[in-house]
Amino acid sequence: MTEKVKITFLGTGGMIPTEKRNHPAFFLSYGNEGILVDCGEGTQIQLRKAKISPTKITKILLTHRHGDHTFGLPGLFRTLAMLGYKKKLVIYGPRGIKKTIDGIFQAFGDTTEYEIEVKEILGKFLETKEFAISAEQMVHGPLCNAYSFLVKGNTKLDKKKLKKFKIKDGKHLSELKQKGYMNYEGKKYVLKNLAIEEDDKKVSFVLDTAFNDRIVPFVKDSDVLVCESGFGEELAEKAKAYMHLTSVEAGKIAKKANVKKLCLVHISERYEKNSSELLKQAKKHFRNTILPNDLDVLNV
């Protein structure tokens, strides 16, 4: 069975943090991978509250260089060094993000005992046997990426079918998986006739962007879409001017892209007391929409 993807919503707020919502940050865990998507101010504290050790981080995906998505990095870098972090920390982001990271170390005169590698990426930039991560350029002030994390569905043998054909356990089953066929007791068996194909799982993150034609194809068929919703429909013109999405646009994107679940994030402080209105607006267009709170966890 494909291993579960777990999303911890460390920060669901917008540019100004509030009592309830921290700057944007999301932790995606899958197997031995701990992927931090954005690192706003206060992310370290949120990790502690979520009982996630910073040393669990294997990769950081930065959507763009704006402070509400990056101000948590200087402290995180120093904490990892203090905790004896031994892994190579790989940071991915749009073109120009290397200059941002270099600037952090220049500003604080800091060094780390562990290796940091910064990669400026677009398109599918990482693929293993189990998963792939891709980036797509969005429309914001500075260059900005959306990200998708795709877990490849497994092919597993169907025990009921094996029993039906009286096929016992043994090395021949390993051969079946490797070659796609096997000879067993004088008969030839094909893998697809004895197996169950699990579906892929896809999680997408769209933060800080104006509506554009690249969003829907990129997030298409996502099991979970974590999408910014900084403005209500009543402020649609302002959202457009500042290059952000409204809750209505998020709902329409989810519906058109055949998404299974929509999570509204990047909630502006102006909606601190009535964020449910954003949820209501999005649900008119896409029913399976939720409004996560900080430290909520979602298993995919």
Place the predicted regions along the sequence by residue.
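Active-site-proximal loop/helix segment associated with metal-binding centers of metalloenzymes
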Residues: 17-18, 129-205, 209-218, 224-226
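General small-molecule cofactor/ligand-binding pocket signal
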Residues: 8, 92, 117-121, 134-136, ...
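Binuclear metal-ion centers of metallo-dependent hydrolases, dominated by the metallo-beta-lactamase
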Residues: 123, 212-300
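Active-site neighborhood of divalent metal-dependent phosphoester bond hydrolases
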Residues: 85-120, 270
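Active-site metal-binding motif and surrounding structural segment of the metallo-beta-lactamase
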Residues: 42-92, 117-122
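Metal-dependent catalytic neighborhoods of phosphoester/phosphodiester hydrolases
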Residues: 72-79, 101-104, 272-281
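Active-site neighborhood of phospho(di)ester-bond hydrolases with catalytic His/Asp-centered motifs
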Residues: 37-40, 57-65, 69, 93-94, ...
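Conserved beta-strand hairpin/beta-sheet module of binuclear metal-dependent hydrolase folds
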Residues: 2-50, 88, 147-149, 155, ...
